[in-house]
Each structure stands twice: as structure tokens, then as C-alpha cells.
Amino acid sequence: MGWKETYENRKCTPQDAVNLIKSGDRVIFGHCICEPTVLVDAMVANADAYRDVTITHMVSLGTGEYTKPEYKDNFRFEGIFCGAGTRKSVEQGHGDFMPVYFNEVPVWIRRGLLNFDVCMVMLSPPNEKGYCNLGVESGYTYQAIKSAKTVIAQINSNLPSTYGDTCIHVDEIDAFVEADTPLFESAPAKIGEVETAIGKHCATLIEDGATLQLGIGAIPDAVLAELKDRKNLGIHSEMIADGVIDLVEAGAINCSEKTLHNGKMIVTFLMGTKRLYDFAHNNPMLVLKPVDYVNNPAVVAKNNNMVSINSALQVDFMGQVVACSIGTKQFSGVGGQVDFVRGVAMAEDGKGISIIAMPSVTKKKDGTIISKITPYIDHGAAVTTNRYDVDYIVTEYGIARMKGKNLKDRARALINIAHPDVREGLKDEFANRFNAAF
């Protein structure tokens, strides 16, 4: 049987597709933009047919309808990341969070530590050779498809076709549902004065020829905005967003000095707007690879002049970085922060640097501020990057390097880049903590 006949025979309605899910099954979604919205909606609509179905995924941009209390007998969320649609279920006790470094997710799948019965994913229509394309993600989704007992795909012609480990043959899919839904879009964040200042500070640490890892949001975009005069920048990053396009078009990013995959931007997933997805379509400069390769610290270390930029919710006097929890509440997940912090530290040329960039304070609705630089992390908070790995901390008030400093000097450097309104209080805490004058 040829692939075209296979495809036609396996086409079905969303309802028929989700009937392949059985009570007690474990279901994994495609990551981020590859979450098949039509199939997820059909699964929730079919909830009465299920009992004890476990849902697993990393970043989800959906509403997390399956986590609502009324579905507690039907679905249970056990995620490797918490987002807006899922963190409440974990907080309320009918969902769970599973800590794992992003680079290890495909490894866990292969070793059976993260097991599932059904993979639901979004793919492009098959090409003339019978291969569908993941388009915006290789991440763990590629491995999930290879390992699942049953694979259900929403076929969406809005997905771009990309180079790398993104091709899935029709024979590997058990059911196809054609539905051209709009792709999730994450509009560029507004860059304010604080983010601009942080971007300027970070830019002073980035030389011509650097290879960058950075994420999505106002701070990464602010950093990129300050790099348009740089030459021969490269990308080896867990993800990219729209801000990278401006630097490619300006000629600042051309990957010409990369020591690994010269001339290519290496990423594991995309998250942005239609502009980014159009940029990615059939673009040989952009290559998507699984996260156990892209985020593998040993692979990251092969890039000369490597710079990683990540964020934090809190940093204490010792340099401990909290990026995925607020006290005892799980807020997100580790993502690739530690993967890249460690990879950069292992860089073979000895020039890699990692930056944790964040506003100095969080502003509450009533206008009061909470310092992100604190003597101690909050009770119950989980350390993301530990004090032995942390390198640079950047706020709008400056740069504090942690490596090469004892604990007192680390605390002094951090207090000097804290918000001016909290510095005196932090100095008092310093005296209490270290029995020494500031």
C-alpha cells in the first residue's frame, strides 16, 4: 500500500480519533505550538468516555480545560512544566509536577521513565514523499512520536516546513484529522525603560562572533535590540522568537563564526508570531533538532564564545537562582536554563558566560515593590540554578558577577544592583547574615 492510500484510509473525524484513547491511558501532547488544539478539544468533549487518563506535556498554550475540577475523575495532569492553564491544578492537588531538565525529556522517554500510550500532535500535510513536518518543534515531540503506541495527528497546512529532525512519515501515524486552525501566536512583549536598561547592560558582555541562547519576552528582545551593530553573531538556543529576525535582516546574525553547525541557527522549538513561522518556512539557515541534542551541555560546550541569557524570579545573597517556583507554588519549570548554564561553563574555548537577567523588583497592584534580590530564598522555593553554577546577574541597575567571589562579596555585588529603595534594608540584612560591615 502506498503512502497516499495509507493517509486516506487513516483520515477521520476528531471524535473518531480521540476514541483511540482508552481509560487508564497516558497521553502526551506535542510541545508548545505543536499542541493539536482540535484533538484536545475533542478529547475534553469526550470526557465521559474516560476514567483516569493522565495528560503530560511541557509548555502548553491552551486553556488546560482538562485540569478543571469537574474532570478530576476523567483526566489527571502530570506535567513537566506548569503554565497559566495548568498550575492551578497542581496547587489544588489534583494535578502533579514532575521535575526534569529539558534536555533529559527525550532520554526519559527512551528509558521508560516518562511513559505514555498515546501521542497527540500537530503536523503539516505530507509532502510528495509522504513526510509530514513538525514545523515549529523537534524538542521532545520527535521522540514522543517514535515511542508512542498510538499517534494521532492534527494536519494543519498553516504549519511551516522546516529543516532538521522534523520529518514524520505517514506510516508512523495512526489517525489523521485535517483542520487548518490558526497557530498559537505570542506577540512581542512591550519593552520599557527597565528592560531597555537591562538589555544595554547585557549587551556589554556580548562580543562580535558570539553564539547566543535566549528565550522569549521583553528582556531577550531588549538584549537583541542592542546588538544590531554586532558582527557575525550565531544562534544555538532552546528556542527563538521574533526578535531574532531583526538581527538576521540587519546582518548581525549570520552564524559565520560558529564552531558547531557553521552557518546554521540551531534551535529546538519556535514560539512567536506568524512573522516567525513565515521566516522559518523552508529556511535552510534554520535547523530544528531534538532537545537532548540542542540542550545537551556537552554539545553547548562545543560552541565558542557562547553566551546564555535566562531569567529569574528571585536571587539570594549566595547567588542561588529561583526561576520556576514562588515559595511552595510551582510556577513554571526549569526549561533549558540549567542545561545552558552548565554547557556554557564547560565551553571548550573557556570564554562562555551565562547571564541571569531580571528586573530588580516585582511591582504589586497597590504600587508597592518586592525585591527580587533577597537575603534568603522564600520558604519552600526550589533552587533552579545553584550557587556553584551561577555566573552573571544583571538588573536595570548593573551587573554583578558571582564567579570568583566569596559569599560576602557576592552579597555586596548583588546589593549594589538591587533597587535603590531596598538597598539600605539589604545592607542591614547583610550585617545580620555575615556578622560583618557592608
Regions found by a protein language model. Give the residues of each.
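Conserved alpha/beta enzyme-core scaffold
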Residues: M1-F438
